[in-house]
């Protein structure tokens, strides 16, 4: 019998959902302006947001940067097959790589699904040959380069 503490699911009311929806689209909105939109005081909005942060519902506030505007022109999705006994080791090494923007363990034969961004093709090739292929346990790598982005959403939308 496990005695590990489980955090209960937080029940969000409609006002919390409204606040989260607005913050998802307008993360820099002031508490005052947000309060006007959800019919609460600035102090009440701030208290609710702090509760959502403390409960782990809001993980962080961040800016979404357009990679092309800062010289990053190559966006690649990778499926990395790894020998099962090395999966955790490979994942821990890849999560430290600056080019890796997301990394997931997927269903299938020990698959890691990864997204990476690079300034050019040569940088991507160097990542593959010097950083990814040499990792112990990597069996195969499948890459798909992004041609055009139609939709990209950060975080979860309610």
Swiss-Prot record:
Out of the domains of life, which is the source? Bacteria
Q: Which GO terms describe its biological process?
A: response to amino acid
Protein name in UniProt: Uncharacterized HTH-type transcriptional regulator YwrC
- Tell me the Gene3D superfamilies matching this sequence: 3.30.70.920, Winged helix-like DNA-binding domain superfamily/Winged helix DNA-binding domain (1.10.10.10)
Q: Tell me the first and last residues of the signal peptide.
A: none
Q: Which organism is it from?
A: Bacillus subtilis (strain 168)
Q: Which InterPro entries match?
A: ArsR-like_HTH, AsnC-type_HTH_dom, Dimeric_a/b-barrel, Tscrpt_reg_AsnC-like, Tscrpt_reg_AsnC/Lrp_C, WH-like_DNA-bd_sf, WH_DNA-bd_sf
GO molecular function terms attached to this record: sequence-specific DNA binding
Keywords, comma-separated and alphabetical:
DNA-binding, Transcription, Transcription regulation
The record ties this protein, via CDD domains, to:
HTH_ARSR (cd00090)
- DNA-binding region, residue range(s): 31-50
A GO CC term? cytosol
Q: List the disulfide bonds.
A: none
HTH asnC-type domain ranges (all copies): 12-73
Q: Which Pfam families match?
A: AsnC_trans_reg, HTH_24
């Amino acid at each position: 019998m496990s005695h590990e503490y489980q955090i209960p699911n937080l029940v969000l009311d409609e006002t919390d959902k409204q606040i989260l929806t607005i913050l998802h689209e307008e993360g820099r909105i002031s508490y005052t302006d947000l309060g006007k939109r959800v019919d609460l005081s600035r102090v009440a909005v701030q208290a609710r947001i702090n509760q959502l942060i403390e409960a782990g519902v809001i993980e962080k506030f961040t800016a979404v940067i357009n990679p092309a505007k800062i010289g990053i022109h190559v966006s690649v999705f990778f499926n990395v097959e790894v020998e099962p006994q090395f999966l955790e080791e490979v994942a821990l090494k890849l999560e430290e790589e600056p080019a890796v923007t997301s990394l997931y363990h997927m269903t299938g034969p020990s698959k890691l699904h990864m997204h990476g961004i690079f300034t050019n093709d040569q940088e991507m090739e160097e990542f593959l040959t010097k950083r990814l292929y040499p990792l112990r346990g990597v069996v195969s790598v499948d890459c798909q380069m992004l041609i055009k982005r139609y939709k990209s959403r950060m975080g979860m939308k309610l």
